[in-house]
Structures are given as structure tokens and as C-alpha cells.
Design a protein with these regions (language model features):
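Short, ordered coil/turn segments that flank beta-strands lining enzyme active or ligand-binding pockets
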Residues: 44, 54, 142
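Thiol/disulfide oxidoreductase modules built on the thioredoxin-like
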Residues: 109-113, 121-164
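Structural microenvironment flanking redox-active thiols in thiol-disulfide oxidoreductases
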Residues: 72-111, 121-128
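Short active-site neighborhood of thiol/selenol oxidoreductases, capturing the structured segment around
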Residues: 52-67
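N-terminal "domain-start" segment that seeds a small globular fold
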Residues: 23-51
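Short loop/turn microsegments at loop-to-beta-strand junctions
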Residues: 37, 59, 134-136
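N-terminal export signals
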Residues: 4-24
Length: 173
């Protein structure tokens, strides 16, 4: 419940900051073109790891919550995308903003999601990525530079999405 109030406040704040160019949407947000800072991500159903350990390959970061309908809607397409490119052309990870770890873990188990997921209870990644509404998917190049941010549910394994990902990363998929 508290998370929803924070998200509502974030939406209202976003409306205000969109009127003033150059302002970030969340405290400490890395804008498109900026390089993500290194943080330790707390693993869900897997080990914790540093964000920097994923450098060297293009990275797709999906910010989600178990209570978010659009997040759940697109999660299957992210799973299929991660399986399709399992051999290392790109990495796909999820960042849960759930207040309660057990809810996120239960959702992952029940939905059969196998790509690496982490929890962000201290809002470090949520703020750095600018996740003032969900879902948010961030495309990050091999050096950690933010290439694009997409809000809202998307069919990430569709031909159109794969072509868009390939264009951003300048790779052939």
C-alpha cells in the first residue's frame, strides 16, 4: 500500500518535472546517455551480484512489482527473450520493487521465470533508473551506458521489439 502511494506521488512529480527540461524524475536518476553506478543487487531465488559484473554485454533491465498487472503481463515475453538469447548475446535481468521479498519470490516461482531477478527494497536502483512508474525497461550498453528507457508493458520477444533492441545495441539478433 505504501509503495502505491509513493508511485502515485511519483506520477504527480513526473508531471511537474516534464514541464521543466533537464530535470531528473527521481533522486539520483541516471538519464539516457549516462553510465550506471555500480551497486550490489540482492538476489531473488539466486545469488546477489554487482551490477558491474554484467558489463561486457548489452543488458536489458526490467523494473517490476508482483502487484503490477502490466509488469506481470510482459514478464513472459522477457522470459522468452532471455531464453532465446541465452548463449550470451545479451543479458536480461529483473529488479523487483516489492516491499516484501516473499511476494516477489512467490511470483517468480509460480510464473516460472528463470532469468536473474533482484530486489530493491532500499530504492537505490529504482531511483537510479528513474522508475517512477512501472513497468520500466532500460536498455544498457556493454559499458554500462543507458541507451533507452521504456515505460509500460511491451511484447519484448516480438519481431518489432527485437529489431528495436538490435538497433539500440547495434548488434544483429
Amino acid at each position: 500500500m505504501q509503495r502505491r502511494s509513493v508511485l502515485r506521488a511519483g506520477v504527480l512529480a513526473t508531471l511537474g518535472t516534464r514541464l521543466i527540461p533537464g530535470l531528473a524524475n527521481t533522486p539520483g536518476e541516471v538519464e539516457v546517455g549516462g553510465v550506471l553506478r555500480d551497486v550490489t543487487m540482492q538476489g531473488l531465488l539466486g545469488p546477489s551480484r554487482k551490477l558491474s559484473s554484467l558489463r561486457g554485454k548489452p543488458l536489458i533491465i526490467n523494473v517490476w512489482a508482483s502487484w503490477c498487472g502490466p509488469c506481470r503481463e510482459e514478464m513472459g515475453s522477457l522470459e522468452r527473450l532471455s531464453r532465446r538469447f541465452w548463449d550470451g548475446e545479451l543479458n536480461v535481468i529483473g529488479i523487483s520493487t516489492d516491499d516484501y521479498r516473499d511476494r516477489a519470490e512467490t511470483y517468480l516461482r509460480r510464473s516460472g521465470i528463470t532469468f536473474a531477478n533482484f530486489i530493491d527494497q532500499k530504492l537505490v536502483l529504482e531511483n537510479m533508473l528513474g522508475a517512477n512508474r512501472l513497468p520500466l525497461t532500460v536498455l544498457v550498453d556493454a559499458q554500462g551506458r543507458v541507451l533507452a528507457k521504456y515505460f509500460g508493458a511491451k511484447a519484448w520477444d516480438s519481431a518489432e521489439s527485437i529489431a528495436m533492441i538490435a538497433r539500440h545495441f547495434r548488434i544483429k539478433l
